[in-house]
Swiss-Prot record:
It is found in: Cellular thylakoid membrane. PSII is composed of 1 copy each of membrane proteins PsbA, PsbB, PsbC, PsbD, PsbE, PsbF, PsbH, PsbI, PsbJ, PsbK, PsbL, PsbM, PsbT, PsbX, PsbY, PsbZ, Psb30/Ycf12, peripheral proteins PsbO, CyanoQ (PsbQ), PsbU, PsbV and a large number of cofactors. It forms dimeric complexes. It comes from the Bacteria. Chlorophyll a 10 binds at G106. Belongs to the PsbB/PsbC family. PsbC subfamily. Residues 1-46, 134-155, 254-268, 450-451 are cytoplasmic. This is Photosystem II CP43 reaction center protein. It comes from Thermostichus vulcanus (Synechococcus vulcanus). [CaMn4O5] cluster binds at E345. The chain crosses the membrane at residues 47-71, 112-133, 156-178, 233-253, 269-290, 425-449.
Amino acid sequence: ATNRDQESSGFAWWAGNARLINLSGKLLGAHVAHAGLIVFWAGAMTLFELAHFIPEKPMYEQGLILIPHIATLGWGVGPGGEVVDTFPFFVVGVVHLISSAVLGFGGVYHAIRGPETLEEYSSFFGYDWKDKNKMTTILGFHLIVLGIGALLLVAKAMFFGGLYDTWAPGGGDVRVITNPTLDPRVIFGYLLKSPFGGEGWIVSVNNLEDVVGGHIWIGLICIAGGIWHILTTPFGWARRAFIWSGEAYLSYSLGALSMMGFIATCFVWFNNTVYPSEFYGPTGPEASQAQAMTFLIRDQKLGANVGSAQGPTGLGKYLMRSPTGEIIFGGETMRFWDFRGPWLEPLRGPNGLDLNKIKNDIQPWQERRAAEYMTHAPLGSLNSVGGVATEINSVNFVSPRSWLATSHFVLAFFFLVGHLWHAGRARAAAAGFEKGIDRESEPVLSMPSLD
């Protein structure tokens, strides 16, 4: 096979798929095999989590990141997020494991046995990186698949058993979403919101109607855009504006993935609707507000007048007013005054927290939930001795929110660097001055061996 070495491809073995830039068949094999690795990890890791799973303990105490995703989709859980059946977790793991074998076979086939280039095999699957019309057609197929993916969530929510709704009355429960939000003013209003504070841009979505309605919109938009890109050829301005090369497309993709990674970071850190706290543990603001509530309850039982007690700063010790006049929790948690959560909202009135409800109407389940969330804040250090930094070493808890937010932030940053790197190379190559490092006269080649 050609393009296995530096002489035939211009790239050394460690440059990986760069050797396959012009071998569409081999590149297909690499991508299908990569998909197989991804799906294999999903299946194997789900089964690993299930093998270690203790139904009596919260998922977030067991370091789980995959089973919570399955549970959020409404499989295997019931009222309050309690696991009622672990079999769906097993099924999801096995289905991914089996499909990864199919992908693995396809990847190996196209890497070893299949045609090196698809062009001589099929005009439909073949392509040339510089063929602008073919590239936008491929873009169209990708958009249609993404749209179908979005609509699959809609189908699960509306027709196949529903999703887990942490806001369901009487405590979270699996609920069929029968009335998704289709009003474009609501859906696109999220995109126009400020990203700061309680506004929170799209991350502020706090009900499943809006989530499912948004997926209906984005699914239909992606499918319509896909059909458009298949049927049309790029306009002159687009032909002139973009760089049309394999490396340019790589940079566009990395840029998009970077953006998605940063958005996912904010979602898993702040949003407790699509990442229910029953599965992922409390958000940072949630744990802080829960601590304020826990000690308010304790001191109120001991006789404190929580409505008028003054703290060491002269502000209210337990309750104070927000910048816009609502009654909020006092102390350091004041910065999280726009937190919303299903365990706290029943205590609100028309002007923030309702003093009458706080004095007379806090339910035992709210007290327990606040204490649980207070002690499971998403704090943690590198060596996994979690909890507050001053905590004794017997505490060993790191929230899945910490792991997921940190990993997605770091990966999103790496992808952003990769985007800039490949965009710069692609633009330089298009402008005709891209040289790279001259491998013939690379200094290291003339240096003596390290040993």
